[in-house]
């Protein structure tokens, strides 16, 4: 099953974030709850965790790019 990884809301008034650093690469195995990317907002650095266990099949927003809250940033194919 394909699982979307969306940029979560990090606080009141925060509508976007810049993907600072991917901790996992495409094709790597991820565990549910594992931190996969760090996102920089106007207020802090936020860690985004994998919503499912499986393979990170596609990164849709590269490090250094900005995305709106709830935008899909990656795809995980569940084991």
PLM region descriptions:
Residues 1-79:
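Mobile cofactor-carrier "swinging-arm" domains
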């Amino acid at each position: 099953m394909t699982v979307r990884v969306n940029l979560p809301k990090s606080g009141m008034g925060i509508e976007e974030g810049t993907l600072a650093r991917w901790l996992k690469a495409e094709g790597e195995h991820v565990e549910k709850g594992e931190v996969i990317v760090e996102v920089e907002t106007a207020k802090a650095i936020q860690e985004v965790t994998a919503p499912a266990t499986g393979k990170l099949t596609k990164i849709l927003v590269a490090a250094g790019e900005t995305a709106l809250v709830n935008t899909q940033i990656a795809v995980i194919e569940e084991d």
